[in-house]
Amino acid sequence: MCIRDSGNTVTSDSVIRSELLLDEGDPYSKLKLSKSISELKARNIFKKVQEKIVDGSKNDLKILEITVEEKPTGEIAAGAGVGTEGTSFSFTVQENNYLGKGLMVDATLSASEESLRGGLTMSNPNFNYTGNLVYGGITSTNNDKLKSSGYENTITNLNIGTKFEQYEGIFFSPGFDLSFDDLRVDGTASDKLKKQAGEFTEFNFNYSLQMDKRDRAFMPTSGSVASFTQGLPIYADQPSLYNRLTYSKYHGFSDDVIGAVKFYAATITALDEDVRLSKRITLPSKRLRGFERGKVGPKDGEDYIGGNFLTLSLIHISEPTRQAEISYA
């Protein structure tokens, strides 16, 4: 099989070919072609992706022609609002195809009357043309709640990792993260917060195992995907063990209606004393919509402090043609 691509004036050819499960000289496979086109669409850097099979110069030779239509991949967003934490501001710069090499860059800054958060992440889905994902980032968060809850903490986190397909449909994702946590309290803080005051450093090794049996990565209609994640302390002033399990099962009821059952569970266990406030589990906002970020779970006074255990079951129904989604938790 011969492969030709066109329409990519900004995007490098290597970005397109890195997502293909078919290589030059391979026999034609309709299943691999369908999955390849799905992977290209999932990159979210093309407005349209079209494929065409034409006969070659010989009877047993096929030519795969892939035509793409590029779209703006950069996004700048700014917002302001008034809520339970008072006035808040946010600013985000995101690029999904940096330098036309498929690099993803995300910079965020958000501020409210009691918190300030900033972060920069970057990932390369095809590092050194190996097909392996490599990512890294840094985030810093400052919560100044001396007036309302008697504490102030600053958390800085650095992470780096990779993800690759070890076997067909089996992905392995090892990584490291380094965090610094400084918690200061005054006399009005709760006893639980006073016990956790101080400066703490933690260096962890994290890994994930994922089994992906979906028919395609972009808007799957059948199959399932399951993953297990664990965080192991290499060095920690107050160590803890983190575990997470996720599972999603998809089923297409018709061409227009796709259903999914999703399960999410996570635990964190202290290996010395109590789990630190900054390490407790909170429900990711993308898992349960309709709630403010970090505003679900146990509370200490007026503060949401997270917990040591979390479970979530979700029934999700989507209509891709209408771009409509319904979720039941």
Model-derived regions, located:
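Single conserved hydrophobic/aromatic residue that forms the stacking wall/gate
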Residues: 1-3, 316-319, 323-329
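C-terminal outer-membrane beta-barrel translocator/porin domains of Gram-negative envelope proteins
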Residues: 42, 75, 188-198, 202-314, ...
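Feature captures outer-membrane beta-barrel proteins of Gram-negative bacteria and organelles
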Residues: 89-98, 116-129, 134-136, 156-166, ...
